[in-house]
């Protein structure tokens, strides 16, 4: 194949200036269309980049809020754990005092013959001592009850 056979004007006569002007006009029109298309494409890319930058800023702000909240919760957890440790020690101390008082009351009851109302210790497995635990095992929803879930 020769290079002249690949030319878009191959097979045309060189005397047809009307076709050449039309080809030039089409090429110029296509060039302008391509420029406009490229400009719109750059504009879309810039808008997308701006949106991504805004999203990054929003996500960083959200991340900072979540991190601050996590720090607050961690400090509250530490404070509550310390308070629980103090309360457990106090409960153990009060339990010891109750046992001592009960022993004294039993001795008084034994030697005086007067019946005493002796408060016995609360059992160690008392659910009131475990407020965050259920006093009974959590039962799963029966599989045969899907009719109960109406939205």
UniProtKB/Swiss-Prot annotation:
Residues 26-45 are annotated as: Basic motif. Gene3D superfamilies: 1.20.5.170. GO terms for cellular component: nucleus. Residues 52-59 are annotated as: Leucine-zipper. It holds the Pfam family bZIP_1. InterPro entries: bZIP, bZIP_plant_GBF1, bZIP_sf. The keyword Plastid does not apply. It is found in: Nucleus. SUPFAM superfamilies: Leucine zipper domain. Residues 1-47 are annotated as: Disordered. Its main location: nucleus. One of its GO terms (molecular function) is transcription cis-regulatory region binding. One of its GO terms (biological process) is positive regulation of DNA-templated transcription. Residues 24-87 form the bZIP domain. Residues 1-17 have a biased composition (Polar residues). Residues 22-39 have a biased composition (Basic and acidic residues). Keywords: DNA-binding, Nucleus, Transcription, Transcription regulation. Roots and shoots of young plants, and basal portion of leaves. A derivative of OCSBF-1 that contains only the 76 N-terminal amino acids is still able to bind to the ocs element. Belongs to the bZIP family. May contribute to developmentally specific patterns of gene expression. Binds specifically to ocs elements which are transcriptional enhancer found in the promoters of several plant genes. OCSBF-1 is able to bind to a site within each half of the ocs element as well as to animal AP-1 and CREB sites. This is Ocs element-binding factor 1. The lineage of its organism: Eukaryota, Viridiplantae, Streptophyta, Embryophyta, Tracheophyta.
């Amino acid at each position: 194949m020769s290079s002249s056979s690949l030319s878009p004007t191959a097979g045309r006569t060189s005397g047809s200036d009307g076709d050449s002007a039309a080809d030039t006009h089409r090429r110029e029109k296509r060039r302008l269309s391509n420029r406009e298309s490229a400009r719109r494409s750059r504009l879309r890319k810039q808008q997308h980049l701006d949106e991504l930058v805004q999203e990054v800023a929003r996500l960083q702000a959200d991340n900072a809020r979540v991190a601050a909240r996590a720090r607050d919760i961690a400090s509250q957890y530490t404070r509550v754990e310390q308070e629980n440790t103090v309360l457990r020690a106090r409960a153990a101390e009060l339990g010891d005092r109750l046992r001592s008082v009960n022993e004294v009351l039993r001795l008084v009851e034994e030697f005086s013959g007067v019946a005493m109302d002796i408060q016995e210790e609360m059992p160690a497995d008392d659910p009131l001592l475990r407020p965050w635990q259920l006093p009974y095992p959590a039962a799963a929803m029966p599989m045969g009850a899907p009719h109960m879930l109406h939205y």
